[in-house]
């Protein structure tokens, strides 16, 4: 899961309501033996307190909230890339563009591994597709889904191995 291991302390900053991202990632992280802090969403001051005081190594959030947290941490005179242990970001709930990923590295450090996942609360929450640490695009969970990849211009179905949408 994005490079997470049993040695990680994960802070989940997704809501634990009807959005299934929090519970899905919570369960997956516990399954690999990571410690999980179920922060839920909001309360930026408390989020920052836990990030700094609990030795958090992995942040689960939307990419925009991770950037917001980084900005707020910097306002306190703390450099997230040097003063915190966070080295992995598992992001979902919204898309992460390459410029956002570049900004993540500026805020959280060059060694910060940030991957994104895709899910739908109506089906299974997180787990439809996700990036690995190679960051070459998302992998569809083929145990559950059969993807149909099409050419964006012609809308024709592409053969296996071809890139499309």
Predicted features along the sequence, with ranges:
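Conserved coil-to-alpha-helix start sites within the AMP-binding
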Residues: 14-26
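Conserved adenylate-forming
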Residues: 1-9
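Short hydrophobic alpha-helical segments of the AMP-binding
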Residues: 10, 29
């Amino acid at each position: 899961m994005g490079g997470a291991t049993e040695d990680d302390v994960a802070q989940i900053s997704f809501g634990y309501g009807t959005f299934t991202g929090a519970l899905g990632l919570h369960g997956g992280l516990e399954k690999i033996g990571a410690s999980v802090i179920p922060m839920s969403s909001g309360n930026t001051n408390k989020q920052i307190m836990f990030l700094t005081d609990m030795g958090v190594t992995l942040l689960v959030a939307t990419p925009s909230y991770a950037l917001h947290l980084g900005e707020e941490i910097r306002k306190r005179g703390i450099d997230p890339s040097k003063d915190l242990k966070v080295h992995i970001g598992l992001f979902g709930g919204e898309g992460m563009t390459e410029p956002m990923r570049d900004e993540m590295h500026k805020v959280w450090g060059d060694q910060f591994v940030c991957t994104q996942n895709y899910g739908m609360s109506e089906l299974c929450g997180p787990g439809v597709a996700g990036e690995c640490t190679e960051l070459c695009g998302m992998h569809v969970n083929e145990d559950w889904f059969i993807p149909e990849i099409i050419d964006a211009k012609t809308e024709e179905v592409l053969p296996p191995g071809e890139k499309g949408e």
